[in-house]
Amino acid sequence: MQTILTAERLWDGARLIDHPVVAIEDGRIASISTRMAGDLPGAANILDFSGATLAPAFFDVHIHGAKGHDAMEATPEALGTMSSFLASHGTGNFLATTVTAPLDATLRALAGLAKLLAEPPVPGQARPIGIHLEGPFLSHAKRGVQPAEYLLAPSTATFDRLFEAAEGHVRLMTIAPELPGAPELVAHARSRGVRTSVGHSMATAAETQAAIRAGAINATHTFNAMRPLDHREPGILGTALTCDSLYAEMICDGIHTAPEMVKLWWRAKGPERAILVTDAMSAAGMPDGEYMLGGFAVQVAGGRAMAGGVLAGSVLTLDRALKNFMEFTGAPLEQALRLLTVNPASMTGLSDQVGSVAVGRVASLVAVDAAGKLVGSVVNGLAVTASR
């Protein structure tokens, strides 16, 4: 039986369509029309999101865990639990994100993730569409909670071991541009189809620009774990804000970055280069307590995830990030939606698969109200009740 979605509007990733009718068959979008084109089929399962806007499901390029599980567990239970939780918050696709750990442990996690990522998408669950390596090529000074003893110097040989363990599923890698050999590794990763993001870094502007010339395309959680802005040495942060070609992530939870700085970032990057991420860890969707991020313990209380007095990821979800962003900046809905759909898809080179609504695509859509609040979603062809 067909599933039919109706709503006030559809934002398909490029344009707004009034009174849309989206037909879904066998988990894919079969047609897109409007109510003006005729009556709805009588035999269909009709989901009416009156007053809401349909849009592509969200894409989180930086998430470590959720609902008590960490991506580096690399088990069907861990990824399945994460994926179900993410779907209930409007996320249809995500990059399973690692943290710095002993190299052998990272290789084992990547091998396990590779097997899971090769499985077909599960209806009603967000799809892990790739891997984001956050570490081990990070700055000691700006490592955050990532363990110093496992950080490594940039090395094409080490990268190749990681890439091959993941069976080519690595889509994004964070690297500190000031480390010796960083530009060469950025170029090497690019040659293997991996996008690189500058972050966890004390880099100068010149060092950051060298990484960008080598192919770096993104900045990891802007403002966090970065050399502070200085009017004589803009550093990695000033470069991230002013380089027109560079995408820039934001953890928009009101904890990692003040609303005023979110507004500054938005004015600098605009609707073409800004990306919302969660950087969520295993405590997302769970009560306060102690949880794991990779191999170390994190204390969570009142929405803050802390380890050793340092923020250690978040408990944010992308639906909350969207609403926060609109409240902090006053951005219109169709611009705000780009930050969770079109932009992350473009940055990762996955625009041919995700980030837009089109006939033939996997049916993963959200319905949001005018304030950006999630009211429902369909993920991999199956309707999912929005979590509150």
Feature annotation, model-predicted:
Residues F49-R108:
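Metal-associated gating/positioning segment near the N- to mid-region
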Residues G65-P76, V145-L152, R195-G199:
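Active-site mouth loops of central-metabolism enzymes
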Residues T75-A78, G112, S155-A157, R232-L237:
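Charged helix-capping and loop-helix junction motifs
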